[in-house]
Amino acid sequence: TIGTLGIFYTRENKGRFEGGADRYRSRDLTDIVMTQIVSDIRRTCEPEWNRRGLWNRAYYEARVPGAPTMLLELLSHQNFADMRYGSDPRFKFLVSRAIYKGILQYISSQYELPYVVQPLPVESLAAEFAADGKVAVSWSPVMDSLETTAAPTGYVVYTRIDDGGFDNGRYTDKPYLLSEQEPGRIYSYKVTAVNEGGESFPSEVVAACRIPGGKGNVLVVNGFDRISAPLSMRRDSLAGFYTELDGGVPDKQDISFIGGQQVFDLAMAGCEVDSIALGACNCDYETEVIGGNTFDYPYVHGRSIARAGYSFCSASVRAVGDRGVSLEEYSAVDLILGKQRSVTIGRGVAGYAFKTFSPELQDVLRRYMAGDGALFVSGSYVATDLWTGGEATPADRAFAEEVLHYTYDGDQAADRNRVRVVTSHAGFSRDEYRYVDDFRPDRYRVERVDALRPAGGGAFPVMRYVDNNRCAGVACADSRTFVMGFPFEALESDVQRDRLMADILGFLLGGKSGGDD
């Protein structure tokens, strides 16, 4: 069974609710909600999404309630094509919002009142230093192409100091806010959009900190905005989700994952024995919460930057590209890429999203590095996405080799989560580091890491994976770049992150020469 089905019942109690209302209101509700769901799915990610129909049947849940009621069979968990969508956080949000809009339209039609849909979250968030010790927090509203009433009329800015909780927020009708800051403390900000329909989900989090007598200003750019389903493939006689290769990225947390898929054989699709049928999974995580993208990594990076003696601001990668946040004003840039990589949704008809280095970002970084900038980049797919990704081009590879001074040496670079510093460069501590490679409720899992090779004069290996000696980090003293094939924020502890960040910034901004393996 493929597609969406709606169920209602009109024949109970002579076709009337207890208050006398016609039970055909349940049919109206079902039709409106289903129409909204199917329309939104077809317009965004699957133009051939199937609308199965409306059933007037005496299901208990449709028959007993004394108010307009519907049952929604959105998709089938036994259908691989459906679950490629159903496992994706973007699809879950799209459908949930469509259900909300459908219910709102139904209530509006019953009472003959206009309705307003809550806005979408804002984007292009940035926190930069302003005059008089203040910080300017700015963003861009997002217009909903599926709903004209969802335009924001104002915003609420929430503030967190150091590792405390967020406050109750400050309202503004403009897409920016000046915030007072106490030197030496980290201020974090998230923004919601509001209108008569309600308040949007919160934006990602940006942060800033002024260090008295600091060594310089660093800009943290969050380029990790990916949320997606696990890697899925259908080839010849096999189909399924390959969570050991790429478990996807939940939106903050996931409670639906129960374990990795074990049976991929399409010949077992009709098997009635659950444990050996197509799609059979382990159950070792069925009571666990799985961590995902917290959208709060500028704070994690910034805390280590501040402890190294540098002031920092932060911005989303969209703010750098769309609104022109200037990199040239900063001594160094820390680009967060986490598990960012080009991925599709469902069968891929909507194209790719979440590329590590978009053409616009490449142009911005080229200009910054040509002007004597200093750049730190970390992520699981910094090379894979530019060499073998779905949107990879020769220009991408040239950018990596010419600007960032590394080349691709393979993915799945390590089976163990240990990295050691091997360079003789005096600026790096000869330490060993560990990154998170298991499921945790508050951290995302790193399934794969990239192996890199130095490219160009002055580039040298800094770190290697312990289990196979492949290169995990490349630096270039002449161009002041440092690139890691695993995410910085995935390191096990604050102590490890603080030590490594101090070494990296000392190398990038300390004027020391390169070293050899």
Give the positions of each predicted feature.
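Pro/Thr/Ser/Gly-rich low-complexity, intrinsically disordered linker/stalk tracts
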Residues: 106-149, 183, 197-216
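Active-site microenvironments of hydrolase-like enzyme catalytic domains
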Residues: 1-31, 55-78
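Short alpha-beta junction capping motif
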Residues: 215-224, 231-243, 324-392, 482-484, ...
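A glycine-rich, often tryptophan-bearing local segment used as a flexible ligand/cofactor-contacting loop or short
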Residues: 339-443, 459, 500
